[in-house]
Structure formats: structure tokens, C-alpha cells
């Protein structure tokens, strides 16, 4: 009967504890975080406000956007590609049956390939933007006092992209670490 047990926990009829699925839940959470951060970084960089820089004579004006810097374009494209790959990885992870030992090997291989591709895309794009910010620092900093928020958006986008990169690594590692906890819903047996 429900509620008659003094332990406060539900007792299962077959008295077999469900297998721990904590690493699957943690991996799913980290994949969702990676997806959100990569997409946020790409959108933030793509919407970086235009900045107009006036020359010393006051008449010469240059308009600067993220499209003027190839690493910024690469960050937008790579982070969008990483977002799409993370969506595919989430679909494969949720849809496959990795809780049983005789599960097909193809989804596991796909997840490894996607994990490597996402990390490659995010780290290469983030590194390129960090290098570009150092190389083009004076040009980007010239926009700091302008009406747009180009410089701030570039800085935020590169930090968010770095966070997405770290989250992707943690998701790949957490996938292979057995966590002794079990998270609802319990896998069906």
C-alpha cells in the first residue's frame, strides 16, 4: 500500500534497483548548456552594432561591423554549426538506448564524432576571435566610445564562446564517467 512504508520511499515490486543514469542526465544538461551558449555567442556577434569611426580631419568616416573581420564571421558560422551538431547529439543521446549493454554501436560512434567536431569548431573559432581581438585591438577599441556597443558585444561573444567550449569538453567527459546517482525518469527494463 502507498504510504505504509516508514522509509518514505517508494518500494519497487521487483526489488531490483534501476541502473544509475546520472551521467546521462549530466551529459544532457551540459549539451543543452553548450547549445545555448554557442547560439548566444553567435547571435551576439552577428548582431554586433555598427560603429562609425571618424578620422582626424572629421570628414573621413569608416563603418565597422563584425563582417569586416574574418575571425568574427568564422565564429558565427562555427558556433551555428556547433549548435546544429549539439541538437543532433541531444537527439541521438535521448533516442538511443545506451542503458543496455547490447545497444547498437553506431549511435555511440556518432556521439564521439559529434563531440570531437563540436569541440574543434568551438575552440578554433574562440581562439581565432581571441587572436583577432589582440591583433585588431586598436580598431575594435576605437568603437568603445561610439553609440553602438560593438566592442562590448565582441568581448561578451568571445567569453560566451569560451564558456561553450568548456561546456562541450565537460559534456564529452561526463558521458564516459559513471555517476552513482539515478535521476528520474528511471530507464525502463
Curated annotation (Swiss-Prot):
For membrane topology, the record states: Multi-pass membrane protein
| Signal peptide region | none
Which sequence ranges are marked TM in the entry? 25-45, 72-92, 110-130, 159-179
Specify the species. Answer: Sorghum bicolor
Pfam families named in the record: CASP_dom
InterPro entries assigned = CASP/CASPL, CASP_dom, CASPL
The protein here is known as CASP-like protein 1U2
Topology Extracellular: residue spans: 46-71, 131-158
Keywords for the protein's UniProt record, in alphabetical order: Cell membrane, Membrane, Transmembrane, Transmembrane helix
Tell me a GO cellular component.
plasma membrane
- Transmembrane helix among the record's keywords? yes
Q: Which family does it belong to?
A: Belongs to the Casparian strip membrane proteins (CASP) family.
Give the highest taxon in the source lineage: Eukaryota
Amino acid at each position: 500500500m502507498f504510504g505504509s512504508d516508514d522509509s518514505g520511499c517508494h518500494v519497487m515490486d521487483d526489488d531490483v534497483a534501476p541502473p544509475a543514469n546520472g551521467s546521462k542526465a549530466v551529459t544532457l544538461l551540459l549539451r543543452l548548456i553548450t547549445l545555448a551558449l554557442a547560439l548566444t555567442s553567435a547571435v551576439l556577434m552577428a548582431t554586433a552594432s555598427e560603429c562609425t569611426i571618424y578620422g582626424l580631419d572629421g570628414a573621413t568616416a569608416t563603418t565597422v561591423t563584425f563582417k569586416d573581420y574574418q575571425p568574427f564571421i568564422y565564429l558565427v558560422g562555427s558556433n551555428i554549426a556547433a549548435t546544429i551538431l549539439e541538437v543532433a547529439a541531444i537527439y541521438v543521446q535521448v533516442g538511443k538506448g545506451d542503458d543496455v549493454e547490447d545497444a547498437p554501436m553506431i549511435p555511440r560512434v556518432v556521439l564521439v564524432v559529434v563531440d570531437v567536431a563540436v569541440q574543434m569548431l568551438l575552440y578554433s573559432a574562440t581562439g581565432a576571435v581571441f587572436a583577432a581581438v589582440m591583433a585588431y585591438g586598436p580598431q575594435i577599441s576605437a568603437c568603445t566610445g561610439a553609440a553602438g556597443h560593438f566592442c562590448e558585444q565582441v568581448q561578451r561573444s568571445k567569453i560566451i564562446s569560451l564558456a561553450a567550449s568548456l561546456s562541450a569538453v565537460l559534456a564529452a567527459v561526463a558521458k564516459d564517467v559513471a555517476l552513482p546517482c539515478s535521476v528520474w525518469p528511471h530507464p525502463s527494463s
